Amino acid sequence: EDTNISLWTDHTCVLRSGSALCSANNDAIQNNVVQVSAGNMNTCNLRSDGTVECSRLEAPVWLSLVTAISSWDDHACALKSDSNVECWWDNTYGQIDVPSGLTWVVGISLGSYHSCALKSDKTVECWGDNRWNQSIVPSDLSGVMEISAGWDFTCTLGQTWFVRCWGSSYYGQTNVPSGLTDIIEVSGGLAHTCALKSNNTITCWWRNNRSQVSF
């Protein structure tokens, strides 16, 4: 069975064979779901027909033909089949102001108040909150295979299977451990970062106040 897990501070969602169930949601199991994205007190489900349903951040009624979703604190974004991005809800820091001319997007990831897009040419574009430079993409960044925005930082996985992070490092969450190689997936959280290696082991670093980097 195909299984996907998405979690946040106060709830966890599990997607299995097209059915989504969240631990803090008393609603019935949601069917015909192909992706689930858990944000702060909000969960968005992408249905097989390309529509989106969110528990709190209600999606625009006209939104359709969606292929991927991402949600975090108080905003959400959707990647559409035409490779364009639509975002909605809170815009305090401009996090839903999708840059004009942004096209050929193949992936999206949201931080608390910033949004990032991975383009087909393996470059990255971010917008929104920039108080910790989390939206300033390094000028020499290229060959990106995956992007993951954390609370106030951003990480990418490159073609050479190396991780690169920028933005706030108050807890050291952007300080990628030296010698970390053979990475196949990266994920940024509140103040810690985790990477999955090709040998199916996981390496996490920095803030560990709740044992979030201890295995």
Task: Label each PLM-derived region with a short phrase.
Residues 29-30, 60-63, 99-101, 138-139, ...:
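Surface loop/turn motifs at the tips and blade-to-blade linkers of beta-strand repeat domains
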Residues 7, 15, 38, 46, ...:
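Residue-level recognition of a conserved intra-blade site in WD40 beta-propeller repeats
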Residues 11, 33, 51-52, 66, ...:
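Intrinsic low-complexity tandem-repeat regions in disordered proteins
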Residues 9-11, 40-42, 73-75, 90-95, ...:
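Consensus positions within tandem repeat domains that build extended binding/scaffold surfaces
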Residues 11-14, 22, 42-45, 54, ...:
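Conserved core positions of repeat-based scaffolds
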Residues 1-27, 31-38, 43-45, 52-59, ...:
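An edge-strand/N-cap motif at the start of beta-rich repeat modules
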